[in-house]
């Protein structure tokens, strides 16, 4: 009997264990099929917000933190947002939860919750704090489902966004500083177009004045010397506006609205002076070397070269606004302001070298168009400035001057450890574009022979304006240095001597200093000139990494590209045999140049003969001649007044 009872008990225990396992499996499956994000609703958002009424207890904060984390976006979703995609896989309950949660908290309640999370000093607390910032940024993005966007933000956030008084000390202390801390800790989630634009505007407005003038400090501490601002307050102010710029700049559509003064639907930004605001953002002495400011434009390269029609169109819009704003000499002359950004006359590239690099990045998809190429032919019909050709030439020279104004001279700096300046990088890019243009000319030699001349023309024009930009930046820098000395009366003479030495590499007429440096009858590029110059004035142009030296070497990039496009086979016993690898492919031009022991002009002639196509060669030569003329026509580097009159101040 006892054994019977025991066996039945064991049987029941086994059955119970089996049922328990089934229940656990069902629960686990439920969690897999319906993760926490799917169970969150608008009611949960209101309930969680109501917990703030009597202050946040540890348990309440932890409860809300877990819900916020559950409502967060995945890394994949964030990346798709950054790519400009519309998210259709964010549960409606999550969208409504965020709306109700943030919408039922005032600013003090929200900021106190962040303080609660941060004060925990635990991994969970840090994770919840980040989820809190990310949730607000996510709610602002109209690409998150159908229940998010600027209009879904709390009313106090929208009121703050539309307060454009950058001298409102109370607002800065009570809202700006803690809000920047909140959204600055939001991972990489991008804001929506409107909110992102307002964040960039806040940053630019803040950049227009110093911490001393902003009213950041409490009124009682503003007595006495207004410039005795504690370092901590000044640092906090800079950190605040940089965070707004960083978060706002995550949105390419917001950056485009800021650069153009219009939202994507064509609506103009309210109370917005585009030139002033962009100028504030670019001229400010950012403590990150202009990295955050550069994020407003550096994405243009990737979008412009993506081949995605939507992204290309956005890049074209943004670059159109950037080009118009930064190169204009009409009205208040924004270009002059950017070249003289502070009381010392420093250019933006010297103040913010990362910004100069970002301008270079943004310009790369448009190099051929900047010197007269057809926008539609080169895949950027959205960038088609309605500007006369001669003014387009001058504007391009101004853009290249801004890029070259970073003033590194090839020396390593904290911001640029490899020692390559943006201007030097730009000229290398121009030579690379020359190779690509040559390759296209070679590929089309049989089907579209007329294209060779236009491609050569664009390439030569581009090289000329690139050199003009290098010269313009150096001229401006040395003029600024002279203005800071007591030798003002000697400044004009000194600058004329500098111009004389630089002109050897910028004109077709050989300068005595260039003879022996380049091929006979050709001019050396300006960075190869010796330090000595007329009047013993040192000229310190940057060094081009891997770039050309003599004019012959610069032109060689075009012919080399044509050889690559033609896919010719070298004749046995000729110099050309040494230019090819065993697999029949051309060696990199840098290798060919380094292996060649003779004159660069001789090598250029050998490459021209190797083309084996007299018509193609004639077209390349004719286009190069025309392009060189165009590049010099509106910028005479032998005349020091030319920079002031035509480049800095605009044409008459």
Where are the regions that the model predicts?
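Short linear, low-complexity motifs centered on an aromatic residue
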Residues: 254-284
